[in-house]
Amino acid sequence: MATNNANYRIKTIKDGCTAEELFRGDGLTYNDFIILPGFIDFGAADVNISGQFTKRIRLHIPIVSSPMDTITENEMAKTMALMGGVGVLHNNCTVERQVEMVKSVKAYRNGFISKPKSVPPNTPISNIIRIKEEKGISGILVTENGDPHGKLLGIVCTKDIDYVKNKDTPVSAVMTRREKMTVERAPIQLEEAMDVLNRSRYGYLPIVNENDEVVNLCSRRDAVRARDYPHSTLDKSGRLICAAATSTRPEDKRRVAALADVGVDVLVLDSSQGNTIYQIAFIKWVKSTYPHLEVVAGNVVTQDQAKNLIDAGADGIRIGMGSGSICITQEVLACGRPQGTAVYKVAQYCASRGVPCTADGGLRQVGDICKALAIGANCAMLGGMLSGTTETPGEYFFKGGVRLKVYRGMGSLEAMSQGKESGKRYLSENEAVQVAQGVSGNVVDKGSAAKLIAYVSKGLQQSAQDIGEISFDAIREKMYAGQVLFSRRSPTAQGEGGVHSLHSYEKKLFAAKM
């Protein structure tokens, strides 16, 4: 049966064009072509849509939120990582502000807490209240000497101190004592520890050694998040993966040092034209100074641009120049490339070098994301599609009875006046006259980004199913082998492929049972 199915997959009749033939002539974008269907012998739920973001980081959902100041701050970055993607924190702010955002993301979901907050038994309750307010934690370990890895005596939680009137009372008088606590002995796997927490009624699970000394700690909050978001993008310690943008000027080395200190996982070098001596030198410096950090370089639209950045040590490449919905680089500067052609050409070269690439710009709907992944991109970066969601920065406002949010390009005059870093992206931060390469506008409230990403995920699975492949890795492999076929679309065909011939209609993209 399997052999017969394999035979059904092989395209023996040349009906359509290969990707190489499709992109041989004029520059194309996503709406200019369509993917031809293949043979289906599996369910959509079986499709693996995961993609490589950098050499070492793979995303369960190959979606990255753009480092724009109206798209990605800590709330969006948390949501993206929880859902299985990753968010790139914008850098149009002070170093200190960006560092705080990274800390917020990294602290949102812990695996093992290696240095849990601990106090000695004579600590007054007033100190516990202060620590809880400053750190935002509800449970504090009590150890023999206050050392995070000292002998465990007990734990003090909010319920233990809420009704104690004398705030000078020592925690030893109100804490839950060691003999009444649920603990586990090291070594233990994180999944086992989370399972114990799920089955117990306690908020925290200390892990101790044979001397009853604290090794680390697990919290119920993190166990619940692990249960509710089983495909989260995590680091080796079980914390959410976090990426952050930076420019490539010498003074940006201080920003990188500060980000590295608080545990950022990926640096995204943010430039509209990445093939510069500044970025090449910056990549080399980062990889030699912080070899554990992954570096995504760009933006590029040609193979030569990508080659220079990969030669410098880039762990990932970002593709796109002037194709975003709020970007006017191509019309103002007459420089760029149609995004479909850019993705195919650059991704082809990146694949030959074993470096993942991310398509950035021109993605208006799930079909565009599918096309980008099918012609070579490993991941897709979203800005406009995520704009107006609850997790984006900024407040909603009403105009004409419609609930809106601001969405602007980082090359807009508004963004460049907000912070110097936006100007650095376009190599114009010190210019007396700044040429806008983006616009600012308003977008309609789209609800939760979590629901939108879930919709994108399901849409990608169904797209791959129609193409007839079990994963996008398989689609790309077959595409390069000429076994995934395409067709050009005329303007009339594009109109035919959309909604037409109706007096009126309401376009709902998904119905969420969440």
From Swiss-Prot:
K(+) binds at residues 322, 324, 327, 496-498. One of its GO terms (molecular function) is IMP dehydrogenase activity. The active site is at residues 327, 425. It catalyses: IMP + NAD(+) + H2O = XMP + NADH + H(+). IMP binds at residues 325, 360-362, 383-384, 407-411, 437. Its cofactor is K(+). Mycophenolic acid (MPA) is a non-competitive inhibitor that prevents formation of the closed enzyme conformation by binding to the same site as the amobile flap. In contrast, mizoribine monophosphate (MZP) is a competitive inhibitor that induces the closed conformation. MPA is a potent inhibitor of mammalian IMPDHs but a poor inhibitor of the bacterial enzymes. MZP is a more potent inhibitor of bacterial IMPDH. Potently inhibited by MPA. Inhibited by XMP and GMP. One of its GO terms (cellular component) is glycosome. It is found in: Glycosome. It is an enzyme of class 1 (oxidoreductase). Pathway: Purine metabolism; XMP biosynthesis via de novo pathway; XMP from IMP: step 1/1. InterPro entries: Aldolase_TIM, CBS_dom, CBS_dom_sf, IMP_DH, IMP_DH/GMP_Rdtase_CS, IMP_DH_GMPRt. NAD(+) binds at residues 270-272, 320-322. Catalyzes the conversion of inosine 5'-phosphate (IMP) to xanthosine 5'-phosphate (XMP), the first committed and rate-limiting step in the de novo synthesis of guanine nucleotides, and therefore plays an important role in the regulation of cell growth. Heterotetramer. Interacts with glycosomal protein sorting receptor PEX5. This is Inosine-5'-monophosphate dehydrogenase.
